[in-house]
Amino acid sequence: MATKLNKKDRLRQLKIEIDKNPFYTDDELAELFSVSVQTIRLDRMELGIPELRERIKNVAEENYHKVKAIVGSEIVGELIDLELGKSGISVFEPTPDMAFLKTKIIRGHYIYSQAESLAISVIDAEAALIGVANIKYKYPVRIGDRLVAKAEVIRKRGNKYFVWVMIKVKNKEVFRGKFILASLESDNTEKEVQ
């Protein structure tokens, strides 16, 4: 926003911006409106808009019931969008205990777990397993980074699903994976995955 708005206009515009993108941080909103973070927090409270973590949780709760292949609590991160058999988005904020002590870089298996659980979540099947994973860690993830993962089902052939997952931190790709998942029939889990 180029010019500072008066409070009434700022409150109206803040509501519009958060409705458009509920994942704005208070810092991002403060920068957008050229005010302090404290002002944004007070404005949010006045409008009855919860903090980011609560907004993400509310959106995620609406999506967990759609997942078939795993239980919602098994998903790494908050599932904020899901279209079964097509695509999904999750947000994950690693905690300090997930990082290496010396470098403060998040351990790779947490990043992979977010991608894997999202890939399994988008599959329109009662049970699914990763058969093949081709992954690439592109940049280190640090404490305080917010990971946004997007999964897309590229192709389905028989009981095989081809899913691409991209994870970004502030629009910078930090991880990508191409997964081949096999949906398992509930009465026969002995089938070969690949």
UniProtKB/Swiss-Prot annotation:
One of its GO terms (biological process) is negative regulation of DNA-templated transcription. Disulfide bonds: none annotated. It comes from the Bacteria. InterPro entries: HotDog_dom_sf, Thioestr_dom, Transcription_factor_FapR, WH-like_DNA-bd_sf. Transmembrane segments: none annotated. One of its GO terms (molecular function) is DNA binding. Keywords: DNA-binding, Fatty acid biosynthesis, Fatty acid metabolism, Lipid biosynthesis, Lipid metabolism, Repressor, Transcription, Transcription regulation. Transcriptional factor involved in regulation of membrane lipid biosynthesis by repressing genes involved in fatty acid and phospholipid metabolism. Belongs to the FapR family. This is Transcription factor FapR. It comes from Thermoanaerobacterium thermosaccharolyticum (strain ATCC 7956 / DSM 571 / NCIMB 9385 / NCA 3814 / NCTC 13789 / WDCM 00135 / 2032) (Clostridium thermosaccharolyticum). The lineage of its organism: Bacteria, Bacillati, Bacillota, Clostridia, Thermoanaerobacterales.
